[in-house]
Amino acid sequence: MAADKSSLEKQLEDYRFALSKVSHEVRNPVTLINSYFQLLEKDHPELKQNELWNDITEEMLFLRRLLDDLSCYNNTFHCQFSATEMSPFLLKLSESVYLLFLDSPISYQISVPENLPTLSVDPLKLNQALTNLLRNSFESAAQSVSFSVVEKQDCLQIDIINDGASISKEQQTEFFKPFVTTKTNGTGLGLPIARGIIEAHHGSIAFLFPEETSDSKNTPDNPDKSGTLLNHMSGSHLRIVLPLC
C-alpha cells in the first residue's frame, strides 16, 4: 500500500513537472506574439476596425488566461501558511467580490461571525479560491447570492448559494474536472483550482442537494438553525469545510 502511494505521488509530481514545462515553453512565444500584435496595432490603428483582428486579440487574451490558469492549477498544493484571523479575512473577501457587481440588481447576503478562530491558511490562495467561487455565483444568472460561515466543533463550514440556472448532479460532478465549463470564454479550470487549494488546506468542497440539507424549504430570507442560507428550488449550493486544526 505504501509503495502504491509512493508511486502515485511520483506520477503526480512528474505530471506537474511536465505541465509546468509545457506551460513555460508555450508562454514565451505567446508573449512574443502578443508583443508583435501590440506593435502592429500601434503602427496600424485601422486594424482595430477589422473584425478578424478583434477576434484574434480576444483569442490571444483567452490563451494567456488559459496559461495563467494552468500555472495556478499546477501550483495549488504549494501553499505558504500563516496564522490568519478568519472573521476579518472572510468578511473582507466576501464584501470585495460584491464591489465588482455593484451595478447588478442581485440581492447579496453575508453572514460572517465576529469571533471566528485564527487558522493557519495561505490567505492569498484561499482568497483566490473563495473569490472565484463567489464570482461564479454572481455570474450564474442569479437573483440572489448568499455567503455564510458557521463554526462547528472541528471545522469552519462555508456555504455559497445562488438561485441561478440549475445544473444536474451529473454536471456538478463533472465541473470539478479540468477543462469542463459552460462559459463561452471559460477555461474550465476555476473549480479544479478552487478544489485543489481547499484540499491543500486539508478541507473539502462539494455541491449539496435538497435531500442533503436539513430543510430544503429554507430560502435566503429564512436561514436554517445552523445559520446556512438555503435555497434549492434552483441554482446551486457549494459547501466548503476547513478543519480547525
Question: Which residues does each PLM region occupy?
Answer:
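Short conserved segment of the HATPase_c
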Residues: 167-178
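Conserved micro-motifs of the catalytic ATP-binding
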Residues: 76-79, 118-121, 182
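Conserved signal-transmission helix
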Residues: 1-14
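Short beta-strand/loop element within the Bergerat-fold HATPase_c
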Residues: 144-154
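Detector for a conserved hydrophobic position within an alpha-helical segment of the HATPase_c
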Residues: 198-199
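Conserved catalytic submotifs in the C-terminal HATPase_c
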Residues: 107-117
